Amino acid sequence: DSQSVKVSNHGGVRGYDAGKKVLGRKRHLLVDTLGLILHVVVHSAAIQDRDGARLVLSILQQRFGWLRCIFVDGGYAGTLVDWVKQLLPRRGLRLQVVKRSDAGKHRFKLLPRRWVVERTFGWLSKFRRLSKDYEFRTESSEAVILIAATRLMLARLA
């Protein structure tokens, strides 16, 4: 999943996310079923979610050969599913789209696996440094997110 955040005025890569009306950057997270971050990519907010997901999923072959199923929300349906089938056909990787139920529009319904990455974004929002992107380089932004995730994991162990 992705999250759009504003950037500070000192420069760096930025773009406009028209859907969320944010001038800044997007953070894409790949998390496991516990909500622990496996991979993070930060880029301009002008890049669509499906294209940003390709940046995240392109690393799967090298680093995460043990993954078999990836849960994504409805925003990633369509061409991304076909792209994964073409890119990694022999690995047995499956992209499962978890769609919202339109039956209960006005009620909250907990959908399986959809809330895991949202919960991770909620955990990361506790860190003031991540409320806005203060870093000049996107690589530095990724490192700050991984540091925050490390602190969260260490707090669970304690």
Predicted regions and their residues:
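Basic, amphipathic alpha-helical segments enriched in Lys/Arg and hydrophobic/aromatic residues
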Residues: 78, 82, 107-158
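Short gly/pro/ser/thr-enriched loop/turn and capping motifs at secondary-structure boundaries
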Residues: 102-105
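Polybasic low-complexity intrinsically disordered regions
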Residues: 1-91, 96-100, 148-149
